[in-house]
Structures are given as C-alpha cells and as structure tokens.
Amino acid sequence: MKDLNYFYYSKSFNFKYAIFFVLLLLWVTSIKAQTSSEVYKKLKKLNFLGSVLYLAAHPDDENTRVISYFSNHVLARTAYLSMTRGDGGQNLIGAELREALGLIRTQELLSARKIDGGSQFFTMANDFGYSKNPTETLTIWDKDQVLEQTIDRIQKFKPDIIINRFNSGSSGRTHGHHTASAMISEWAYEALHKNEKAWQPKRVFHNTSRYFYGNRENFKKANREGMVAINVGGFDPLTGKTNSEIAALSRSQHKSQGFGSAAALGERMEYLELVKGKKLSTNNPFEGIDTKWTRIKGGSPIGKAINKIIDDFDFSAPYKSAPPLLEVKAMIFQLNDTHWKKVKIKEINSLIVQCLGLKLQFNAQMPYGVVGEDLQLKLIANNPSPLTVVLKGIEFKGEAYDLNFSLKTNRLFNKSFDTKTSGAISSPYWLTQKGTQGMYITDKKEWIGRAKPPAAYKAKI
C-alpha cells in the first residue's frame, strides 16, 4: 500500500501543492469515477491548448456535430454562447411557456453539453418571439448590453476562433434574432481588435451550408476560397461512437421542441467560411495558432511530461498516472500565464480524482428546505485504488471539520452533519427582477452569462 504523500516528499515537492490539492479540489455535490478510455481521452485533452466558441441565437440553433467535433476529436475547449434561453419557442412536452419554457430549454442545453463535451453560456437577451429582421431585434434587445455581455464572455473564455451559426448578411431572409447574433459576434471581434490589451480571437467563421445559398446547386458553384471543409463523421475508438452519433444524442436533448436526430453514418462534411481574421492557406481553422504547451512561456517541459504520462498510461491500472500528474500539477503552478494555469489546474485536479477512481458525494437528505429548518448533510467517500488518500477535512457554511481519515483500498467513509437551512432563497438569477420585453435584468453582475446560479451550498473537501 502506497501513500500519496510519499510522492510529495520523495520528489521534494513543496507542501503547498498538497494542501491546495486537498482543500480546493472539489466544489460539487458528487464526483464519480470514469472509465479508463474516458480518462485517457482527458489526458490527451490536457495536452491541447486551444479554444472554440460557437455562437447563435437560441437553444437548438447550435450545430452539435461541429461542437462535438471540436470537443471530442480536435480536443479543444469548446463552448456554445446562446444569445437567449429560448423563452419564445414552442413546448411539445408540457404546458410551460415563456420564462418557464426558458428554464426547461436551459436544462436541455446543459444536458446536450454533457453529451457533446462543450460548456454553455448565455447573454441576458430575451427570446421575445419571431422577429422580421435584425433592426427590429436590436431595437427590442438592448444592443449595447448584449454586445457588452458578448465581449465579456469572449474575454473570460478566451476563444482562439469563433464560429457563428448564422450569416450577418441574411437580413429579412431568416429570423431577426439569427442575423442579429452574427452581427453582434462580428462587432465584438472588431471592438476587441481595437483594444490592444484585450483578448483578441484570431478568426471568426460562419458555419455555412447549402441552406444559406438557397439550394445544393448554388452551394456547389460557390467560391470555396477561405472556406474550411471538415469531416465531422469520424469514428472515436475511445467512446465506440462516431461523432455523428454523439452529436445526434446531444441534439435529441431538445425535447420541448420535438427535436430528435438520427445519426448519419459515414462521411459528413461541415463548412466554415472565414468572416474575420487572417486568411488560411490550409484546411485547418487553427492555422498559425500554437495549440501546444509551447504557446506558454515555460510550458514546453509540461507538454513533454504529459506526453510521457500518455505513453505510459495503463488502461488496467489508471491510478498509476496519479503520482506523475501531481508532479505536472506542481509544474503548472509555476507558470505566469494565469488563464491557462486556471484552466489546466481544474482539468488536472479532475484527472487525478478520476485516475484514482475516487467516489465522493456530499448531499442533502431532502431536495428542498425552508429557511431555519433542520438540515442533514451526508458525506460519502470511497477510494478503490491501492494508493492511500487522506481525507483531511471538509468546509461548508463557514464551518470547518477535521476528518483525517485514511481512505485505504475500497474502505468506505460516511459521516453526517446537522445544520440549518439558511441564506438567500434559490432562484434563477435572471428572473429575480422584472425585465423588459427584450432583456432580463439582474443585480448579480458576476453571474451574467452563466447557465444557472451557483449552488445554494458549496463544500471544500
């Protein structure tokens, strides 16, 4: 039986890395182990430093084939920014409409992203219903606010490339929200490239198709210069699925809209038309963008270390990768690049837990509570690996509890905590104040863009 602390001291690790790992690793209610193939894929993703932001107007506007392709095959950080939450749509599964429908469609998007591997963001724009043109849309929306929120999300996510679902020149030929979303994306790009201190995406693409050209024949005749053709129908042996199958499962989460998508087997082409940025000489949308650890000063040794972990990965004993990942984590801590440091520390923390196969749950014993009511919380932990992990303690609601429990192989730990329900009443942050026809309003400025508010309680394990 080995103890993880051994790897810190025998390798002359600074103790602060161990403390940071133990205290700040988990902020969620449940962590479950993943298969070795899933862990291996995330190891490879740890070695890719590139980001893609897909942008459109509503839930279900996103092209899940493209999102899944970049997330699962290119291994880029991938996200979908939807201008609205789809409040103005139909509902084929219930009676909920308007704000209640927006809540349902928000959850449908989150379910879709869990499948295709992307992240999900929003602006505070309201889907007020069908709009004839972008001029009308941008009059009812607060154009400046939506643009500011889009710029802010780009600054936080830092995409290398942005992909618009719609064409900014399609006024009058499609939903005004659609065209407006592309216009806002291009305005954001232009504004950021006027600010030398801002994060500047390298390119903006339009995810074009024959639909935007009227028919298949017109699309065949189109000038393909500056257009990237990507085959999104490839097979992923680590999941046993084609990209089309993953995308179809993701697309089928839009149940309120009656959407379901059967996977089309074989080659499936998607086209990205360059709208803004440096022209391409190859079929690679990341052309000229360093997506390796060499993009960061001092990052080259980290890439080499991760490559060795990938080469040495034991599918029958993934826990063997945990100690070298701890060493890589210490190397990442030394970097000056705060953005990629934050992104990759989060990824590597998750990977260490998954390599060990740790199962951690911290749950309330009832789904709802009234302020002042007695509340019981239960912590469950299990470590199936032959490495000993020490459960040092837990903090929640301003209280700290020392545990110092050695999680030896498959030894179950469980402990209950009694407290009282307190704090603000849980509510979707965009619905706590009366909005306008075109915009939701909140005083929680730091939450704008998030799919949902933070959990009522957070725990540090």
What label would you give each PLM region?
Residues A18-T29:
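Bacterial N-terminal signal peptides
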Residues N382-L387:
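Short solvent-exposed strand-capping/beta-turn motif centered on an Asx-Ser/Thr pair
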